[in-house]
Amino acid sequence: MSSRQPLLDALGVELPDELLSLALTHRSYAYEHGGLPTNERLEFLGDAVLGLTITDALYHRHPDRTEGDLAKLRASVVNTQALADVARKLCDGGLGAHLLLGRGEANTGGADKSSILADGMESLLGAIYLQHGIDTAREVILRLFGALLDAAPTLGAGLDWKTSLQELTAARGMGAPSYLVTSTGPDHDKEFTAVVVVADTEYGTGVGRSKKEAEQKAAAATWKALDVLDSAAQTSA
């Protein structure tokens, strides 16, 4: 069995070796190997296919939602962090284990960088669309992103959890959130931990390969924690 077969099994489709390799080729690898084609064109295509599929699904699931509400729901599903999370769970080792990265990128944790994983996920979706058409691509997307679609009404503006959290705390008169960030590890392999403080109280914590990723995860955890507290208060009222 091909070492990439578990990835194809997780996607639920077959792809020609040449097309699959292209979808997995990051620009850092292409540069180190004499300027090979990269997955960026497929990423561009996959982004459009993903956006259309999710938009169509939300439009039909929520007939009473306004355009603005639908845009927020889509942002909670189609964003770098959500794509990266899907990529990490795609198969044993995640998508990162199959990406073709340059040595420099690989040595700095590129296989787990959210931006690279998100781009790779979109590239695969673009490849599926090219090989199998929109119907199959749609089936794959709805299966992989189904849980996110179901949870979209409770997720907040996942495109930018920090902004979403700031809007929530402002609406509740809690003041602006602040972030306490620490890091561990050598310069080439740092891990960042962020803790959100709102009204002198520590809430969510997030860990990531970059300060931005850690803060976004911490903001997401805090948003959800505050939402749970609000729901509990309404239930007991």
Swiss-Prot record:
Lineage: superkingdom: Bacteria
Gene Ontology molecular-function annotations: double-stranded RNA binding; metal ion binding; ribonuclease III activity; rRNA binding
Top class in the EC scheme: hydrolase
Catalytic center residues: 47, 122
Principal location listed in the UniProt entry: cytoplasm
Reactions catalysed: Endonucleolytic cleavage to 5'-phosphomonoester
BP GO terms, sorted: mRNA processing; regulation of gene expression; rRNA processing; tRNA processing
SMART domains reported for this sequence: DSRM, RIBOc
Domain RNase III: 3-133
One GO cellular component term noted in the UniProt record for this chain: cytoplasm
Pfam family, one: Ribonucleas_3_3
Residues engaged in binding Mg(2+): 43, 119, 122
Signal peptide (from-to): none
Keyword set, alphabetical order: Cytoplasm, Endonuclease, Hydrolase, Magnesium, Metal-binding, mRNA processing, Nuclease, RNA-binding, rRNA processing, rRNA-binding, tRNA processing
EC number, as in UniProt: 3.1.26.3
InterPro entries membership: dsRBD_dom, RNase_III, RNase_III_dom, RNase_III_sf
Domain DRBM: 160-228
Subunit and partners: Homodimer.
Function: Digests double-stranded RNA. Involved in the processing of primary rRNA transcript to yield the immediate precursors to the large and small rRNAs (23S and 16S). Processes some mRNAs, and tRNAs when they are encoded in the rRNA operon. Processes pre-crRNA and tracrRNA of type II CRISPR loci if present in the organism.
HAMAP family per UniProt: RNase_III (MF_00104)
Family statement: Belongs to the ribonuclease III family.
Protein's recorded name: Ribonuclease 3
